[in-house]
Design a protein with these regions (language model features):
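Bacterial N-terminal signal peptides
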Residues: 9-23
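Active-site/substrate-binding loop(s) of hydrolase catalytic cores
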Residues: 102-111, 115-259, 275
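C-terminal accessory segments enriched in acidic
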Residues: 28-58, 194, 219-434
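Short hydrophobic transmembrane-like helices used for membrane targeting/insertion
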Residues: 1-2, 28
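Soluble metallo-hydrolase cores and metallopeptidase-like ectodomains found primarily
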Residues: 54-103
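Conserved beta-strand scaffold positions in the cores of enzyme catalytic domains, especially
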Residues: 81, 95, 150, 199, ...
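Catalytic-site microenvironment of enzymes
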Residues: 28, 84, 132-136
């Protein structure tokens, strides 16, 4: 909370917010860019909204947390919240507007109900906007130059169950063409009423790698195509430069863990259509980082990415920004298997053992929960996020009707020997060992 953390942040932070014109906004050289990036991360830490420590939360819990944070700050002068429609099940879908500038910007998050990382980040940005000191130059200059509208939770029914689809079972991000769902119509109506120059399509993805042999992707970026030819018109070109600005900032924090999302044209998707409708749109996909199962570090990095992007729009530096940091990113590669156990022997119910590799796919690859069997057999050439050599060890599965079934729930113990009482090396899922 600000009350305890803000005063103790010291002269360094205070100096960042009291810098003269053009220091936080403007093209000011590498040293000041680094200083500005540090300031954005300080904002992410100092204004983190309590009550959102886990990435699964409901519509009511989210708005209660946001309301508490904004209420403490008496945000009514700086922040406007309005209902823009209701979901299939009647939950309120709200838009938040900040700033009063001539350039309209639209951000929307959690159109997939189980993709909540940026939803948390938007709460933190709103908290900063409402509670930062009156002489906070960054906020004041953003407010003068941009009008920012956020829809933090577009699919509250999906969020209620923490599932991708809405209450009709529809992927809202595949309804931009038909507009059959209320959630899709709401987003389209807001876009049409604002006619935003820039859009941010905020999502989460599974466990992908940066290139075929790269690191786990923390964040993937995309300037979506507006047509089958994937042409680079002026609207998409601006999104490309904006993606480059974000990529350069993130590379400083998680080098090697940024990737470029596939830009094949998807005629039903909102990002592609936003581009086609004239809004320069960037897709930000929050992936996974080691030791970050609740995506709290990615929450922090989304604050950095969004504030970096907004600042580049506001100060005009975007117009001359290089696309190279985006163009040079490795491709975002989907990995079929989360884990492969290689080189061991699988012990069946009759005690016989067989030289079989075992692939495992998690229902939640980030938290590594819900393990299920993938392919079984010779997987020497299979790609996985993690491959564990279990040569000389024995895999003892709990069998489903005497069989190992692809897609079946994994309950497996790795032991030193074929004897079911031999020493335990590992259990999947992990439990207290014998």
């Amino acid at each position: 909370m600000i009350g305890s953390g803000w005063p103790g942040s010291g002269s360094f932070l205070l100096s960042l917010f009291l810098l003269g014109p053009g220091r936080l906004l403007g093209q000011v050289g590498p040293a000041a860019e680094s200083e500005r990036q540090d300031a954005f991360l300080v904002i992410a830490d100092a204004y983190r909204v309590p009550g959102l420590e886990h990435r699964r939360f409901t519509h009511d819990a989210y708005w209660a947390a946001v309301g508490s944070a904004l209420g403490e700050a008496d945000a009514s002068v700086r922040v406007s919240i309005a209902e823009v429609g209701r979901s299939v099940e009647g939950r309120s879908i709200r838009a938040v507007t900040i700033g009063r500038g001539p350039v309209p910007v639209l951000l929307w998050s959690q159109m997939h109900g189980d993709e909540s990382t940026a939803t948390m980040s938007l709460a933190d940005i709103l908290h900063w906007w409402a509670a930062s000191p009156e002489d906070d130059r960054l906020r004041r200059e953003l407010a003068d130059r941009l009008t920012i509208t956020m829809i933090p939770m577009l699919n509250p029914d999906g969020a209620e169950r923490f599932v991708r689809h809405n209450a009709l079972g529809v992927d809202v991000n595949r309804d931009a063409r038909r507009l059959a769902t209320p959630e899709a119509r709401i987003l389209k109506d807001v876009r049409d009423s604002l006619d935003p120059d820039f859009g941010f399509n905020l999502h989460d993805q599974g466990s992908n790698t940066a290139g075929s042999d790269g690191e786990l992707v923390g964040i993937a970026l995309l300037a979506p195509a507006a047509d089958e030819e994937r042409s680079w018109g002026p609207v998409r070109q601006r999104a490309r430069r904006l993606s480059g600005v974000i990529a350069a900032a993130l590379e400083e924090e998680i080098p090697g863990r940024i990737a470029r999302y596939d830009d094949s044209f998807t005629p039903r998707a909102f990002g592609d259509n936003m581009q086609r409708w004239g809004t320069s749109t960037v897709l930000i996909e929050s992936g996974a980082l080691p030791e970050d199962p609740e995506k709290q570090e990615l929450r922090r990095l989304n604050v950095l990415a969004i504030l970096t992007a907004l600042t580049s729009i506001a100060d005009g530096s975007l117009e001359s920004a290089s696309t190279a940091p985006y163009d040079d990113l490795p491709m975002n590669v989907d990995v079929t298997n989360d884990l492969v156990l290689s080189g061991g022997r699988v012990v069946m119910g009759d005690g016989a053992s067989y030289p079989l590799d075992v692939a495992i796919v998690y229902d939640d690859a980030v938290a590594r929960t819900g393990p299920r069997y993938g392919e079984i057999g010779d997987l020497a050439d299979a790609r996985a996020l993690e491959t564990v050599d279990v040569s000389g060890l024995y895999l003892h599965p709990e069998l489903d009707g005497g069989l190992l079934r692809r897609g079946g729930e994994v309950r497996l113990t790795v032991r030193r020997g074929a004897d079911p009482e031999s020493e335990v090396v590992r259990r999947i899922p992990a439990v207290v060992e014998d």
